Amino acid sequence: NIGLRSAYVMSAFVAPHMVKQKSGLMVQVSSLGGYTYLFDVGYGVGKAGLDRLSADMATELNSHGVNSVTLYPGGGVTETTNFPGGETPTFTGRAVAALLSDTSEDELTQLNGKVILTMELALKHGFKDASGELPDGPFSSKENADGVRVSLNSSPFQYNGDGTIPNPNETNNLEIAKLFPGA
């Protein structure tokens, strides 16, 4: 219950310092649940809020040399999730490190306000997960990232006059619940 609020408070505190130094990068870690129905209303609203926070901060801080992006990891392996072949928090950390150390100012300006997939950054910058391999699970592979990018490049159902409401049973079922043993 504190994800979006904490992200906003942190951003509000650090933005003036970044504006003063005329540089900075804010990274919000969200998920595809910010774009399409995933798990439940609370999850989607929180993730959509993070996506909007990044986009709006990019708009307001752009003229001050401060960039803001949203990072979408694939399915993860953490203390509460266990997606087969999933990404570890190390992989997400390496994605942020690549943005900070291996991305030019021009590239950051181009990415400002956008959603970036961890797998896209791994393929571009050549980093791997803690295992020394790229994640290859059905929710974290290159093929999954390619499919997510296609979805992100189209309008969500609520903005598309011909769009259909998602079926919640696709993500709210026993098979998906098994991926969250610690929840």
Positions of PLM-derived features:
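Active-site-adjacent segment of SDR/Rossmann-fold oxidoreductases
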Residues: 13, 17-20, 56-66, 103-107
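Catalytic loop of short-chain dehydrogenase/reductase
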Residues: 19, 25-63, 75-77, 83
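C-terminal helical subdomain
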Residues: 70-71, 83-182
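Hydrophobic structural elements of the Rossmann-like NAD(P)H-binding subdomain
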Residues: 27, 68-71
